[in-house]
From Swiss-Prot:
Binding site for substrate: D296, N500, Y660
Gene3D superfamilies (UniProt xref): 1.10.1040.50, 2-enoyl-CoA Hydratase, Chain A, domain 1, NAD(P)-binding Rossmann-like Domain
Organism listed in the record: Salmonella newport (strain SL254)
Protein name per its UniProtKB record: Fatty acid oxidation complex subunit alpha
Catalytic activity: a (3S)-3-hydroxyacyl-CoA + NAD(+) = a 3-oxoacyl-CoA + NADH + H(+); a (3S)-3-hydroxyacyl-CoA = a (2E)-enoyl-CoA + H2O; a 4-saturated-(3S)-3-hydroxyacyl-CoA = a (3E)-enoyl-CoA + H2O; (3S)-3-hydroxybutanoyl-CoA = (3R)-3-hydroxybutanoyl-CoA
A Pfam family matched in the record: 3HCDH
Gene symbol of the encoding locus: fadB
Sequence segments annotated as region (Enoyl-CoA hydratase/isomerase): 1-189
Length: 729
């Protein structure tokens, strides 16, 4: 053994070939600060070996290196800029030493090589991969850019266009694509990976392969003519401006850095990467996006822990076909859980099957599946008008009309047709689970399961624990949602649960703005372009359905009369009374026509202004900041109340529910991350300016207390140790 660290070791393999093996404690390898330091120490030992002829890098895990240790990021990002820059210089000196070894080097890559893992293998001369490879640089999705030489080496290896596509979009690619673009040199089966790697190294050692020529382009300026460079970078910047926008600075910074570094060799190019990385790491956007990644891991880990002793349902059923029922049935079948779809008429069943078939055909058109796979999936969805087969169902989700009487009747009838241990769930969006459970003989086997539309796209499923829901019931439904590829978050029962409970105060803030003379078009523009929502409130209401919102608004007002009961006729009432129900009938705040792809396209409609004039004061031009404050304060206050009341268990789960269920702008990180970034005292000062608008604007006592003590909702993070101690960690 030449060297042994905590996460890697170095040993002779055969005949002058050494192997450097990543083998961290636990199930995966991460390129954390300690591993980078250990890699440097291993290379120091290796550089003294006069008999060295070649080096093989490999992993003892199912994945090569899954990336940097993102749990370290928040503390690293608090390190002063100069120290962070020094740490990056040190880390890059390690990878440069790997790249500069006087012998051929090869990385045998299995499974994932992402982020720092990808940057590590870019420093070797050759890369051999297994068919399960996923390799790429996802850093821009975390609000940063590659910092270990990825933005320098990848363009010089692949050419500007392919590299820009991966780096700016934060993409990873599979083995076949990686081979095609030159990111790996060969793909072999797992069982022959090491044998193949040694064979390639031998060819390089004997001179049959020119490893020096392979290495040289990574050390030089990017080979692009002025015209080629102008085309590549202009197109890339245009694409990034269109897709990422101003709220996500990392992709544009990465493109501009690669452009600026194109005329330099490795050392100066790495300096430019360093100078770009450090300011990005100190942005609120990076902290928010890293926070989302960590929250996502926390939420998924919690679901995994909850279901560790539970068998995933093998047979499911959906009550109520149509768009929603068909979407749920498709998602379950697509992920391998057969589903019975029951309705009371053929028309609805046909609609549900058509929806499932449409979604599968889209997968076929995109080349994701073949006809055989399509037929196999669709054959596991069984439409029926009766309860045949319900005696072997493990879990049933009811997705009928949002009417408590109808839902109770359907659930009570179904309970008599299933096994005693079968779990029943309701896909209600607002009706309290306790109310629906009152119709059942075994309420302990019942809970809420709130999917979001469109089911195949929206990652969140709210799992609602009723007062009598058993732990086993919740675990079974969480297991099914996880199997469907969704992110389940368990909340406690109340009107609207979590997501709709916090959404309707936001809509109430919108209604009050319109009442006070705001133009809905400007409100939409500000909330989309300035705050960053994917849709403004008017557009969102049209998509949700004005009739749906009108009904839900009444349910929420009954549930929380003190805050959500309004004493005036609002814009939603006016549109509802005029039968303007939004996209579903082509008229809402906007008028809708189908575009060439059959999707609804919004257009101005002057008639809506006359309609809204009856429920509004004369036009008043509100500032952008006023609009944002009046829209967001009611939502933030309600989110805080939900945490204080135990409706949602943690700030992390609340923020993920908002991001995954409502599209809360990821660069803000969620309501609690946004609050912590603003500072609770600053938020309180802002909110108090609007408390005259009513109870929705009154800040909860718990938040007032946080402001008094200047406390954040997330645990405070300490800066990482000084860079000097990081080197020898």
């Amino acid at each position: 053994m030449l060297y042994k660290g905590d996460t890697l070791y170095l040993d002779w393999l055969e005949d002058g070939i050494a192997e450097l093996v990543f083998d961290a404690p636990g199930s995966v390898n991460k390129l954390d600060t300690a591993t980078v330091a250990s890699l440097g120490q291993a290379l120091e030992v290796l550089e003294k070996q006069h008999d060295l002829k070649g080096l093989l890098l490999r992993s003892n895990k199912a994945a090569f290196i899954v990336g940097a240790d993102i749990t370290e990021f928040l503390s690293l990002f608090l390190v002063p800029e100069e120290q962070l820059s020094q740490w990056l210089h040190f880390a890059n000196s390690v990878f440069n030493r790997l790249e500069d070894l006087p012998v051929p080097t090869l990385a045998a890559v299995n499974g994932y090589a992402l982020g720092g893992g990808c940057e590590c293998v870019l420093a070797t001369d050759y890369r051999l991969a297994t068919p399960d490879l996923r390799i790429g640089l996802p850093e821009t999705k975390l609000g940063i850019m590659p910092g270990f030489g990825g933005s320098v080496r990848l363009p010089r290896m692949l050419g500007a266009d392919s590299a820009l596509e991966i780096i700016a979009a934060g993409k990873d690619v599979g083995a076949e694509h990686a081979l095609k673009i030159g990111l790996v040199d060969g793909v072999v089966k797992q069982e022959t990976l090491i044998e193949g790697a040694i064979a390639v190294l031998r060819q390089a050692i004997t001179g049959d392969l020119d490893w020096r020529a392979k290495r040289q382009p990574k050390l030089e300026p990017l080979k692009l003519s002025k015209i080629e460079a102008a085309m590549s970078f202009t197109i890339a910047k245009g694409m990034v401006a269109q897709t990422a926008g101003k709220h996500y600075p990392a992709p544009m910074t990465a493109v501009k850095t690669i452009e600026a570094a194109a005329r330099f060799g490795r050392e100066e190019a790495l300096n430019l990467e360093n100078k770009s990385f450090v300011p990005l790491a100190h942005t609120n956007e990076a902290r928010a996006l890293v926070g989302i990644f960590l929250n996502d891991q926390y939420v998924k880990g919690k679901a995994k822990k909850l279901t560790k002793d539970i068998e995933t349902p093998k047979q499911a059923a959906v009550l109520g076909a149509g768009i929603m029922g068909g979407g749920i049935a498709y998602q379950s079948a697509w992920k391998g859980v057969p589903v019975i779809m029951k309705d009371i008429n053929d028309k609805s069943l046909n609609l549900g099957m058509t929806e499932a078939a449409k979604l599968l055909n889209k997968q076929l058109e995109r080349g994701k599946i073949d006809g055989l796979k399509l037929a196999g999936v669709i054959s596991t969805i069984h439409p029926t008008l009766d309860y045949a087969g319900f005696d072997r169902v493990d879990v049933v989700v009811e997705a009928v009309v949002e009417n408590p009487k109808v839902k109770k009747a359907v659930l009570a009838e179904t309970e008599q047709k299933v096994r005693p241990e079968t779990v029943l769930a309701s896909n209600t969006s607002t009706i309290p689970i306790g109310e629906l459970a009152s119709a059942l003989e075994h309420p302990e086997n019942f809970c809420g399961m709130h999917f979001f539309n469109p089911v195949h796209r929206m990652p969140l499923v709210e799992i609602i624990r009723g007062e009598k829901s058993s732990d086993e019931t919740i675990a079974k439904v969480v297991a099914w949602a996880s199997k469907m590829g969704k992110t389940p978050i368990v909340v406690n029962d109340c009107p609207g649960f979590f997501v709709n409970r916090v959404l309707f105060p936001y809509f109430a803030g919108f209604s009050q703005l319109l009442r006070d003379g705001a133009d809905f078009r400007k409100v939409d523009k500000v909330m989309e372009k300035q705050f960053g929502w994917p849709m403004g409130p008017a557009y969102l209401l049209d998509v949700v359905g004005i009739d749906t919102a009108h009904h839900a608004q009444a349910v929420m007002a009954a549930g929380f009369p003190q805050r959500m009961q309004k004493e005036y006729r609002d814009a939603i009432d006016a549109l509802f009374d005029a039968s303007r129900f939004g996209q579903k009938n082509g008229l809402g705040f906007w008028r809708y026509k189908e575009d060439s792809k059959g999707k609804p396209k919004k257009e101005e409609d002057a008639a809506v202004d006359d309609l809204l004039a009856s429920v509004s004061q004369p036009k008043h031009d509100f500032s952008d900041d006023e609009i944002i404050a009046r829209m967001m304060i009611p939502m933030i206050n309600e989110v805080v109340r939900c945490l204080e009341e135990g409706i949602i268990a943690s700030p992390a789960e609340a923020d993920m529910a908002l991001v995954y269920g409502l599209g809360f702008p990821p660069f803000h990180g969620g309501a609690f991350r946004w609050l912590d970034t603003q500072g609770s005292a600053k938020y309180l000062d802002m909110a108090q300016q609007y408390q005259h608008l009513g109870p929705l604007y009154e800040v909860p006592e718990g938040l007032r207390n946080k402001a008094r003590h200047n406390e954040p909702y997330y645990p405070p993070v300490e800066p990482a140790r000084p860079v000097g101690s990081l080197k020898t960690a």
